Amino acid sequence: MRPLTLPRASSRKFLLLSGLALAAGAFLLTGGGSSPAAAGPLTPDGVVCTYGSEGQASTTQTFTLTARDGHITTPDGNTVYMWGFADGKGTFQYPGPNLCVKQGDRVRVILKNTLAAKTSIVFPGQSGVTADGVAAAPVLDGGGAITSLTPTADANGGSVTYSFVADAPGTYAYTSGTDEAVQTQMGLFGALIVRPAQGAAFAYNAARTEFDPTTEFVQVLSDLDPAIHNAVEQGRTPNILAIHPRYWMINGRSFPDTIAPNNATWLPNQPYNALIHTVANPSKPAIVRYVNVTSVSHPMHPHGDHGRVIGRDGALLAGPNGEDLSHEDFAIEVGPGQTVDALYGWEDTGNWSDPSPAAHPTLPDQPAALDTLHLSGDTWWSGSRFLGQQDKTNFPPGITVYNQCGEYYQVSHSHALNEVTNYGAAMGGMLTLWRIDPINHFDCA
């Protein structure tokens, strides 16, 4: 396990690292949706679900999404003007709420628009979508050109209600269907999770897709070109053909903000974190639901493990007779507009939970291992190579150690390394951490 270190913390970094320490404990946070009854419990890490106003158990799920503008911050101190979907009367957020429903639910989405431009929502993968009770169809101008993929909510107060039956389980996106290249870039998107009839611990109606519901994660992949956003904020027409992303994000954040807990107070409009948190030798795997709303592919790669891809675009990977077509990947390719469901289980194949010398015999005639430990600043390393062990005598004075109980931290990132930057500065962007707790000690309990 390579020790992970960062430069000495600024005041914002101190808040971030303190937030990670909180995320390591068994804390619950509050907030999120405009209606407490409609929102799921907020945890320091993992998926945060928003449920319909009728409550999670109802077979009708009604959501109100309000298109608003606002600002987000980036780890390098930049502030960027955005659009986004708020939960009802809630504040602007980026990305929009994670809408969680059950297979067979009647889903109603009321879109209210406070922006100075028309907007809309499309639901890729959903069939029979209606808008204000009429089959949703593209909107044409007088010359027959498409101006929107679906009926819109007028600017400055317009509204439209979409409805459909969520008949197929899986992971989906919802995005603007109006001037979609610009409006999706501005932030009008979110994730939709349809849970199968077989139960919330399954990704699809197949036993092989079972996962641990306490280790469920959504990673919405987006990019951001400040020039486009500046043009919109200033009332100019953006040149979307000249787009040049400067930031790459997971759940609306770039590293190191990706590892701050859900609802971090210093990221008020970016509520969702991207830390993957599992336990070694799990009885059931974790699931990561990837949602790509960009126009390019992202090869997502966690160090130290492969992911088993079980579904793509809301469809179980199965043959015509139900054959299991899932497969393991070193880097999981998430194409433009695609969603991918992958299972992960970190197995202690090297027996790193046992620090006894007998468990790790020294090979004969090998070069001596020299102590080359040089650390500065803050670290999540335990000081020991063994899972579940800590040795803080390995650290010189002045090191702040955030490790809780000898857990491991692995890097998980886009393997398109230009995307692991914040405005060109390395070790940022579409990157997060994967925390592995000792066997049978999730959250160090």
PLM features per residue range, with description:
Residues 4-18:
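Bacterial N-terminal signal peptides that target proteins for export
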Residues 17-30:
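Bacterial N-terminal signal peptides
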Residues 27-152, 158-161, 233-287, 319-322, ...:
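N-terminal, post-signal-peptide metal-ligating segments of extracellular/periplasmic oxidoreductases
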Residues 65, 109, 121, 176, ...:
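Divalent metal-coordination and catalytic microenvironments
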Residues 115-119, 126-130, 137-202, 324-445:
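Extracellular/periplasmic metallocenter environments
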Residues 204-235:
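Compositionally biased low-complexity segments at domain edges in trafficked proteins
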Residues 296:
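Aromatic-residue-lined binding/catalytic grooves and analogous aromatic/hydrophobic interfacial grooves
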